[in-house]
Amino acid sequence: MIGGIEMNSEINAFINKYVKEIRNNNAAFFAGAGFSKESGYVDWKTLLESIASELGLEVEKEHDLVALAQYCYNKHQNRGIINDVIFEEFSKQKEPTQNHRILARLPIGVIWTTNYDDLIEKAFDNVQKIVDVKSRNEHLSNTLANRECILYKMHGDKNNPNDAILIKDDYERYYKAHKQFLSALTGDLISKTFLFVGFSFQDPNLDYILSRIRVDYEENPRQHYAIMKSIDRKDYESDADYDYAKRRNDLFLEDLKRYRISALVIDDFSEITEILQEIERRLNQNNIFISGSAEEYGVFTKEEAENLIKLLSARLIQDEFNIISGFGVGVGSAVITGALEEIYMHNTRINNQRLLLRPFPQGKEARVLWQQYREDMISRAGISLYIFG
């Protein structure tokens, strides 16, 4: 079981594989429009509803939404209405969903998205992690110091609606106007294992890249995964319509295998959260939160207690566990010293995965922040160890 859902062997195998890839820094994540829908932002159809109405069309009857946006541009010969729609919708303040928060906590170094919103950025900020956002060509040559993740917003950002990728002209020019993004995405698809969530695979740019990779790397392609919702009977008026949609979807999912994308089919969107939670849980099994605060150590002298803590910390690092510490008085410094000595002894690079430090805040506002700090540290740990109080 994963939470409340029955975990089939395919999903279980995927989670084991993806956790391994995350630990080896070989994982990437792709967030489509469906990833932000739970936050209250609209999907593409709803976003373009007013545009369709202005054209005398019904958005529910339109399947090519890129063409619909292009028709609006053709009519007015400018992007004014389209930009207004994007700005009006995404200027609304929304909070990251649980899925965004889990994603931000996961040690994934590369995230791609077609979304214009800033929910991923907010989620990273909430867990005090530095994310390097790339939404324009000029951003690609800049490197943010101490970044923990790169977020590629390949269709632009809500703050620059005029540059957002939405109409046919944008897609047709993308290979030339944004070839740097295509090159970066191609490299990641070749070298990393992707998990696609909330993505429909109707994007012409991604289709182009996947086709090229399939041809160029046919002998040894990278395996990717996509969480896809099953076809629901209640969404269709008749059994015949449902059977047709299901048959077409089955053929579509089978076709994804040509690009080495395995579909993980779920019945309810809540299962996305439970799968992400299980990924985080398995990752955290190797993370140990060591806490304690002491001025006296009972039957131990101060030197004996510190040596014990240092030996424990060093042995945990030696056995491939990761340590999380809040730098508690009388305990935290020994935890850090033991871990660092073991890391340096083996010439290993220090990073937030091996040793994550979250010193507790001091001063008048400390109490306000303490709860947030505790929740952040404990959420990253699979085991909690309390020493000397």
Where are these regions (language model features)?
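Conserved catalytic-core helix/loop/strand module for nucleotide-ribose chemistry
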Residues: 2-284, 342-345
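Charge-rich interaction segments
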Residues: 269-294, 304-312
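Short glycine-rich, polar/acidic loop-and-turn segments at beta strand-coil junctions
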Residues: 33-35, 51, 117, 294, ...
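A short alpha-helix capping/helix-coil boundary motif
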Residues: 78-80, 163-164, 290-292, 381-383
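Acidic/glycine-enriched connector segments
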Residues: 296-298, 304-389
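Conserved short-loop catalytic and cofactor-binding motifs
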Residues: 87-91, 300, 323
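Short loop/turn segments at strand-loop or loop-helix junctions that form parts
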Residues: 31-33, 155-156, 229-230, 287-295, ...
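Long, contiguous hydrophobic alpha-helical segments, chiefly transmembrane helices and signal peptides
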Residues: 111-112, 116, 154, 166, ...
